[in-house]
Amino acid sequence: MMDLFNQRSVTFDEPIEMLYACHDKVRRFCGQLDNLHSYLVKDGCNEMVLQNIRQISQYFNVAAPLHHLDEEADFFPLLLQYAPHTKSHIDELEAQHQQLHNIWSALSEEFSCLQNNLSYLPDADVLNRFTSAYARHLQLEENLFEIGKQSIPTEELTRIGQLMAARRKT
């Protein structure tokens, strides 16, 4: 099939690239969230805003927890095996996963308020805490992805890619 955008598809055969692809989605969603408050002040809530909120909610309620599980159950243990010096960073990232979940809960509440009252203005501080926390998190995590690319044998990456794919089939 022709790729009009000259982008290669990423599969679980390349699990680190798949993790990067998830991060690209997070960055896109965080970009939307960075603009949400000012958009609502200027233009108010409309169907486009509600659709974006539904997409963002779907991602952070379903895909993000799976992504964190991919890292915690598969990638991080393997990285520790081949690059034990990353342990303190992994510990920090796992703690951040819980913090991100907690901030997401607060943001999800803000979304619920907006969906129930279209004139509601979500708390800008909650939006900013969420996007700022993810920006810091992604940077630290991607440093470990690069170490993983250099340290983890291809066969092991293939194995965790299969585990990640299987997790989504259940």
What are these model-predicted stretches?
Residues M1-T170:
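Small-residue-biased structural context
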